[in-house]
Design a protein with these regions (language model features):
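Short amphipathic alpha-helical segments and helix-helix/interface helices
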Residues: 9-13, 29-30, 71-79, 128
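Glycine-rich phosphate-binding active-site loops on the catalytic face of alpha/beta enzymes
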Residues: 4-12, 52-65, 98-134
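Catalytic beta/alpha-barrel core
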Residues: 1-33, 49-54
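Structural motif corresponding to alpha-helix initiation and N-cap regions
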Residues: 7-8, 26-29, 71, 95, ...
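Alpha-helix-loop-beta-strand connector modules within alpha/beta enzyme cores
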Residues: 20-25, 68-88, 131-135
Length: 150
């Protein structure tokens, strides 16, 4: 796949893989996922498979990079459909936040800083088991299919 952002918004000619984008506002999410919106910043608008919205919480890896959205803003965006299965939460994500991210209707979560901080730990199996358990609804089998995190 290919990941686009404000600086790099061009898709290589004849590209056939998945396309994602970084977003830092609800407006960017709406612009990215609304197939009726006009041209993208540098040419025809691509069809995005998913977008990352950040920062949802204070960044773990970028010290001083604070969250941008209030709980109320995220709740409203989830209820209105701005946040949906194509929107991946990024920024300050830890396993304990999974229930809240689900309540806001995020389609998934990116655990960058938390994973990076644990790179020297030897309990990866325990960490991944914790994430899987938080992703699996109570009483359901854990059957992550790769297309949706939840």
């Amino acid at each position: 796949g290919i990941h686009l952002n404000r600086r790099n918004s061009q898709i290589p000619e004849n590209f056939q893989g998945s396309i994602s984008r970084s977003c830092h506002s609800f407006e960017e999410v709406t612009e990215s996922l609304d197939n009726t919106s006009p041209d993208f910043p540098k040419g025809p608008k691509p069809t995005f498979d998913y977008v990352f919205l950040s920062p949802i919480f204070d960044s773990i890896s970028k010290k001083g990079y604070k969250h941008t959205f209030s709980n109320r803003d995220l709740e409203d965006a989830g209820n209105s459909g701005i946040i949906n299965e194509k929107v991946i939460a990024l920024g300050g994500i830890i396993p304990q936040f999974i229930p809240q991210l689900r309540a806001w209707n995020f389609g998934g979560a990116a655990f960058l800083g938390d994973v990076w901080n644990r790179r020297h730990e030897y309990n990866w199996k325990e960490y991944l088991t914790d994430i899987r358990q938080r992703l699996t609804p109570r009483g359901a089998k854990n059957t992550l299919n790769g297309s949706n995190v939840w």
